[in-house]
Protein backbone atom coordinates (compact mmCIF):
# COMPACT_ATOMS: atom_id res chain seq x y z
CA UNK A 1 0.00 0.00 0.00
CA UNK A 2 1.42 3.37 -0.95
CA UNK A 3 1.04 6.49 1.10
CA UNK A 4 -1.47 7.79 -1.44
CA UNK A 5 -3.91 4.93 -0.81
CA UNK A 6 -4.75 6.43 2.57
CA UNK A 7 -6.07 9.57 0.90
CA UNK A 8 -8.80 7.60 -0.83
CA UNK A 9 -9.64 5.22 1.98
CA UNK A 10 -11.47 6.06 5.15
CA UNK A 11 -8.96 4.08 7.20
CA UNK A 12 -6.37 6.46 8.57
CA UNK A 13 -5.38 4.00 11.31
CA UNK A 14 -3.27 2.15 8.78
CA UNK A 15 -1.55 5.38 7.78
CA UNK A 16 0.30 5.56 11.07
CA UNK A 17 1.46 1.96 10.75
CA UNK A 18 2.56 2.63 7.16
CA UNK A 19 4.56 5.71 8.14
CA UNK A 20 6.14 3.88 11.09
CA UNK A 21 7.31 1.09 8.75
CA UNK A 22 8.65 3.66 6.30
CA UNK A 23 10.64 5.25 9.09
CA UNK A 24 11.84 1.95 10.59
CA UNK A 25 12.85 0.27 7.33
CA UNK A 26 14.03 3.33 5.40
CA UNK A 27 17.51 2.65 6.72
CA UNK A 28 17.27 -1.14 6.44
CA UNK A 29 20.59 -2.96 6.52
CA UNK A 30 21.12 -6.21 4.63
CA UNK A 31 22.40 -7.83 7.83
CA UNK A 32 18.93 -7.35 9.39
CA UNK A 33 17.07 -9.31 6.72
CA UNK A 34 17.35 -12.75 8.30
CA UNK A 35 15.83 -11.52 11.57
CA UNK A 36 12.77 -9.95 9.93
CA UNK A 37 9.69 -12.20 10.19
CA UNK A 38 8.47 -13.83 7.00
CA UNK A 39 5.17 -11.96 7.31
CA UNK A 40 6.97 -8.59 7.32
CA UNK A 41 9.98 -8.94 5.04
CA UNK A 42 8.27 -7.90 1.80
CA UNK A 43 6.90 -4.82 3.54
CA UNK A 44 10.37 -4.11 4.95
CA UNK A 45 12.15 -4.19 1.60
CA UNK A 46 9.40 -2.27 -0.21
CA UNK A 47 9.54 0.38 2.52
CA UNK A 48 13.31 0.55 2.07
CA UNK A 49 12.85 0.99 -1.69
CA UNK A 50 10.09 3.60 -1.26
CA UNK A 51 12.31 5.58 1.11
CA UNK A 52 14.44 6.35 -1.96
CA UNK A 53 11.50 8.11 -3.70
CA UNK A 54 10.98 11.85 -3.54
CA UNK A 55 8.22 13.03 -1.18
CA UNK A 56 5.67 13.17 -4.02
CA UNK A 57 7.01 9.99 -5.68
CA UNK A 58 7.55 11.80 -9.01
CA UNK A 59 10.79 9.86 -9.44
CA UNK A 60 9.34 6.42 -8.73
CA UNK A 61 10.03 5.07 -12.23
CA UNK A 62 13.59 6.38 -12.32
CA UNK A 63 14.37 4.96 -8.88
CA UNK A 64 12.87 1.55 -9.64
CA UNK A 65 14.74 1.35 -12.95
CA UNK A 66 18.00 2.08 -11.13
CA UNK A 67 17.56 -0.85 -8.73
CA UNK A 68 19.19 -4.27 -9.11
CA UNK A 69 16.93 -6.87 -10.74
CA UNK A 70 16.11 -8.78 -7.51
CA UNK A 71 14.80 -5.55 -5.93
CA UNK A 72 12.74 -4.75 -9.03
CA UNK A 73 11.28 -8.28 -9.04
CA UNK A 74 10.08 -8.13 -5.44
CA UNK A 75 8.86 -4.54 -5.61
CA UNK A 76 6.87 -4.92 -8.82
CA UNK A 77 5.35 -8.27 -7.84
CA UNK A 78 4.23 -6.89 -4.48
CA UNK A 79 2.95 -3.60 -5.92
CA UNK A 80 0.94 -5.23 -8.70
CA UNK A 81 -0.45 -7.94 -6.42
CA UNK A 82 -1.86 -5.19 -4.19
CA UNK A 83 -3.37 -3.36 -7.18
CA UNK A 84 -5.03 -6.55 -8.44
CA UNK A 85 -6.32 -7.64 -5.03
CA UNK A 86 -7.64 -4.13 -4.40
CA UNK A 87 -9.37 -3.46 -7.71
CA UNK A 88 -8.54 -6.15 -10.23
CA UNK A 89 -6.50 -6.00 -13.40
CA UNK A 90 -8.57 -3.05 -14.63
CA UNK A 91 -7.22 -0.99 -11.75
CA UNK A 92 -3.68 -2.29 -12.28
CA UNK A 93 -3.71 -1.35 -15.98
CA UNK A 94 -5.23 2.06 -15.21
CA UNK A 95 -2.72 2.93 -12.48
CA UNK A 96 0.46 1.46 -13.97
CA UNK A 97 1.77 0.35 -17.35
CA UNK A 98 1.91 -2.85 -19.32
CA UNK A 99 5.67 -2.87 -18.83
CA UNK A 100 5.36 -2.58 -15.04
CA UNK A 101 2.77 -5.37 -15.01
CA UNK A 102 5.00 -7.52 -17.24
CA UNK A 103 7.91 -6.99 -14.85
CA UNK A 104 5.63 -8.15 -12.02
CA UNK A 105 4.96 -11.38 -13.96
CA UNK A 106 8.70 -11.95 -14.21
CA UNK A 107 9.05 -11.05 -10.54
CA UNK A 108 6.57 -13.74 -9.51
CA UNK A 109 8.43 -16.27 -11.63
CA UNK A 110 11.78 -15.21 -10.16
CA UNK A 111 10.60 -15.67 -6.58
CA UNK A 112 9.17 -19.09 -7.46
CA UNK A 113 5.47 -18.38 -8.02
CA UNK A 114 5.14 -19.06 -11.77
CA UNK A 115 1.36 -19.62 -11.73
CA UNK A 116 0.85 -15.94 -10.85
CA UNK A 117 3.23 -14.96 -13.63
CA UNK A 118 1.09 -17.01 -16.03
CA UNK A 119 -2.15 -15.35 -14.86
CA UNK A 120 -0.58 -11.92 -15.34
CA UNK A 121 0.58 -12.91 -18.84
CA UNK A 122 -3.04 -13.90 -19.66
CA UNK A 123 -4.22 -10.47 -18.47
CA UNK A 124 -1.54 -8.77 -20.59
CA UNK A 125 -2.73 -10.73 -23.63
CA UNK A 126 -6.33 -9.69 -22.95
CA UNK A 127 -5.20 -6.08 -22.62
CA UNK A 128 -3.17 -6.15 -25.85
CA UNK A 129 -5.89 -7.96 -27.79
CA UNK A 130 -8.60 -5.55 -26.64
CA UNK A 131 -6.52 -2.53 -27.59
CA UNK A 132 -7.96 -0.70 -24.58
CA UNK A 133 -5.75 1.79 -22.85
CA UNK A 134 -6.63 4.04 -19.97
CA UNK A 135 -7.46 7.52 -21.21
CA UNK A 136 -7.20 10.33 -18.73
CA UNK A 137 -6.68 10.23 -15.00
CA UNK A 138 -9.97 11.35 -13.46
CA UNK A 139 -12.26 9.21 -11.35
CA UNK A 140 -14.74 9.19 -14.25
CA UNK A 141 -12.00 7.91 -16.58
CA UNK A 142 -11.16 5.17 -14.10
CA UNK A 143 -14.80 4.12 -13.69
CA UNK A 144 -15.28 3.97 -17.45
CA UNK A 145 -12.09 1.96 -17.94
CA UNK A 146 -12.72 -0.38 -15.01
CA UNK A 147 -16.37 -0.96 -15.99
CA UNK A 148 -15.42 -3.47 -18.65
CA UNK A 149 -15.34 -7.03 -17.45
CA UNK A 150 -12.60 -8.22 -19.81
CA UNK A 151 -10.51 -9.18 -16.80
CA UNK A 152 -13.20 -10.94 -14.76
CA UNK A 153 -11.77 -14.43 -15.24
CA UNK A 154 -8.12 -13.48 -14.68
CA UNK A 155 -9.10 -11.39 -11.63
CA UNK A 156 -10.69 -14.49 -10.13
CA UNK A 157 -7.76 -16.68 -11.17
CA UNK A 158 -5.24 -14.33 -9.56
CA UNK A 159 -7.18 -14.13 -6.30
CA UNK A 160 -7.67 -17.91 -6.28
CA UNK A 161 -3.97 -18.64 -6.83
CA UNK A 162 -2.44 -15.85 -4.72
CA UNK A 163 -1.63 -16.82 -1.15
CA UNK A 164 0.03 -14.08 0.87
CA UNK A 165 1.74 -16.53 3.21
CA UNK A 166 3.20 -18.46 0.29
CA UNK A 167 4.31 -15.26 -1.45
CA UNK A 168 5.98 -14.00 1.74
CA UNK A 169 7.76 -17.33 2.25
CA UNK A 170 8.99 -17.48 -1.34
CA UNK A 171 9.94 -13.80 -1.29
CA UNK A 172 11.92 -14.17 1.94
CA UNK A 173 13.91 -17.06 0.46
CA UNK A 174 14.53 -15.00 -2.68
CA UNK A 175 15.48 -11.87 -0.72
CA UNK A 176 17.91 -13.81 1.46
CA UNK A 177 19.43 -15.47 -1.61
CA UNK A 178 20.11 -11.98 -3.04
CA UNK A 179 20.49 -10.13 0.25
CA UNK A 180 23.50 -8.14 -0.93
CA UNK A 181 21.06 -6.11 -3.07
CA UNK A 182 18.53 -5.39 -0.32
CA UNK A 183 19.22 -2.81 2.34
CA UNK A 184 22.37 -0.88 3.01
CA UNK A 185 25.49 -2.98 3.32
CA UNK A 186 27.56 -2.55 6.46
CA UNK A 187 30.98 -1.04 5.69
Question: Residues of each region from the PLM?
Answer:
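Membrane-interface interhelical connector segments
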Residues: 2-7
Amino acid sequence: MSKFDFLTSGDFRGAEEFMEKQKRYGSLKSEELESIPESEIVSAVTSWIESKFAEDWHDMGRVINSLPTPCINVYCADYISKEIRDGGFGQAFFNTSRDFIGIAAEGFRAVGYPKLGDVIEQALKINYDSGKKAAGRSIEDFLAFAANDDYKTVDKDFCRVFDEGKFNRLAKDYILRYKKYFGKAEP
